[in-house]
């Protein structure tokens, strides 16, 4: 079962709280299993230019079922995915901040976060993805509190 709107709202709400906790306004996007945008929020004060980036991070993470931070590592010059950012009509984003969302071990969507440093974007996305996974991604399941150092999905 794909990420539904109620799932996306809960993920975004939790991500907004994490972003506020670190003092960084952000754009937060959630995509479904087809990589389609389910929901997006631009926090007050978040960069307008990061709207598109957050959406593309969610798409990229779902399209390849990998954290965009990890894809970025593999897409550097000499890496096995060098040049991938130019594929898919420019929809691929290789900045940190995109993380797959899993339900019962299967990728069902992704979160994309943009507006801070790469480390901040990744930390907010990772904490929310980890909470989604620990709640088994079931609609209505409570989120567990994620620590910033959690290894992720």
Functional labels for PLM-detected ranges:
Residues 145-152:
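N-terminal polybasic/positive-inside topogenic patches
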